[in-house]
Amino acid sequence: MSDDDLFLAGSLPAPLRQDRIVSIVEGAPGLVRTAALAAALGTSEVTVRQDLAALGLEARIRRVRGGAVRLGAGSRERPLEETAVEHQVAKAAIGRAAADLVRSGQCVVLDVGTTPAAVATALVAREDLTDVTVVTNSLTTALALEPAVPRFTVVVTGGTLRPLQHSLVAPFMGAVLPAIAADVAFISGTGLDVEHGLTNVNLPETEAKRMLAATAGRTVVVADGSKFGRAHLGVVRPLEDIDVVVTAGATADAVARIRAAGVAVVVADGGPHDAPARKDETA
């Protein structure tokens, strides 16, 4: 970039400067550091951080520690129906292992997602369970739990409907939660890594997951191996606030990294795999 270009970049109004940042980040193979962006645009790192924060909220780039990376294909929020046909065997195994952690008389929280829905299905199948209260903000999960009524009491949080996930979010989603002291929350996300913990691609869903987890004495993350090593826009729960991860289809290295960070990992399909997790071919 020439001296003239630097001068022009430094004097750009915020929208044009942010467009330039997106262009630089999208053209890079990996992380673009804040300092490099500041130098390229002829502006301060403080200004670049403010721009990155705004662009992250708009889901135009993904902010990470030290800079930004372009949005990958996995950073697009996908409909529940689309994700429901992926990793079905792994999700069913996770559901059964997670359901084994529940005892009669407990209050359980299930958030939105196809893996929590698998937990719901496994809970219903456990005919030994009685007097279980399940709190959820997922219409899909609530319907999956209906066959267990009256053995189970199913509480739907209320809130504002998001059709993409058939979920209930703020405003009003959190109104009932201060009255609930749950034993365990089973929470999912779109990413799980050591640096950020559990993350999710959508901010309203992230906030809902946060609020649900906060009602419970224990947080159990349910995530198949495809979620490991990914970080998305919203931080749901840092690793230090996660009690257990229940997974299937994860590599040995991925499981080892989470365990090394001090989090218990339950491998639901008998043991870590040496090959990367792949999509389940069963529709």
Show which residues each predicted segment covers:
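Short, Lys/Arg- and Gly-enriched loop/turn segments at beta-strand edges
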Residues: 119-120, 231
